[in-house]
Amino acid sequence: MNNRVHQGHLARKRFGQNFLNDRFVIDSIVSAINPQKGQAMVEIGPGLAALTEPVGERLDKLTVIELDRDLAARLQTHPFLGPKLTIYQQDAMTMNFGELSAQLGQPLRVFGNLPYNISTPLMFHLFSYTDAIADMHFMLQKEVVNRLVAGPNSKEYGRLSVMAQYYCQVIPVLEVPPSAFTPPPKVDSAVVRLVPHATMPYPVKDIRVLSRITTEAFNQRRKTIRNSLGNLFSVETLTEMGIDPAMRAENISVAQYCQMANYLSENAPLKES
């Protein structure tokens, strides 16, 4: 028996497809999402509708984004979901969530069992639309969830941690074993809730500057920031900001990264691209 086949559909490796089939896990995720009629619910990667069906039962309308044309066609003809669905057969990485929110007339509630091969770039894509998003619930590789929630002074803490926590409150919801999927992935999974901050705790003047600083610091995470960020900040400047130049990227808090970004925006702003 081919364990990549589920409900007659062959899971495609290039799309990173693993289909959720554990009823307890599904019910737990739907309870965490708590969908309500009238909300602008958007599912990324509905697949074989493991979450789509129980969420759709509670709603009059549901928007889904599915790259796989065969799965999109199955959803179109679904006996009870079909009429409720607005289906975008496209890559979520190309979706303008700001325009979608404007069309639906309210902030989006986004959820999904995300393909692990695109989960990190998709997170960064969604962060650029947090003004249009009320909250997000995602099934991800457990390692990615650990990175999203990590604090300074841990090996999981990295650029993804800083950028996620800059934009959102990040809350782990539950852990999910490989046995909950067909085919079983080789890694553990977890569900995370991301709620965009209503008021930014550490506002930055130019997000591109924060992105640049975190990229340069974490690309050389074993170096002290005196070296990894030496092209941007002098030792004196770091010391004036109360940041020890002997620290490494993983020792610096989100607030401190934002402080550095604002200093750079004021003193050496990036040119408009």
Curated annotation (Swiss-Prot):
GO terms for cellular component: cytosol. Keywords: Cytoplasm, Methyltransferase, RNA-binding, rRNA processing, S-adenosyl-L-methionine, Transferase. It comes from the Bacteria. One of its GO terms (molecular function) is 16S rRNA (adenine(1518)-N(6)/adenine(1519)-N(6))-dimethyltransferase activity. It catalyses: adenosine(1518)/adenosine(1519) in 16S rRNA + 4 S-adenosyl-L-methionine = N(6)-dimethyladenosine(1518)/N(6)-dimethyladenosine(1519) in 16S rRNA + 4 S-adenosyl-L-homocysteine + 4 H(+). The keyword ATP-binding does not apply. One of its GO terms (biological process) is rRNA methylation. Its main location: cytoplasm. Coiled coil: none annotated. It is an enzyme of class 2 (transferase). Belongs to the class I-like SAM-binding methyltransferase superfamily. rRNA adenine N(6)-methyltransferase family. RsmA subfamily. Specifically dimethylates two adjacent adenosines (A1518 and A1519) in the loop of a conserved hairpin near the 3'-end of 16S rRNA in the 30S particle. May play a critical role in biogenesis of 30S subunits. This is Ribosomal RNA small subunit methyltransferase A. The gene is rsmA.
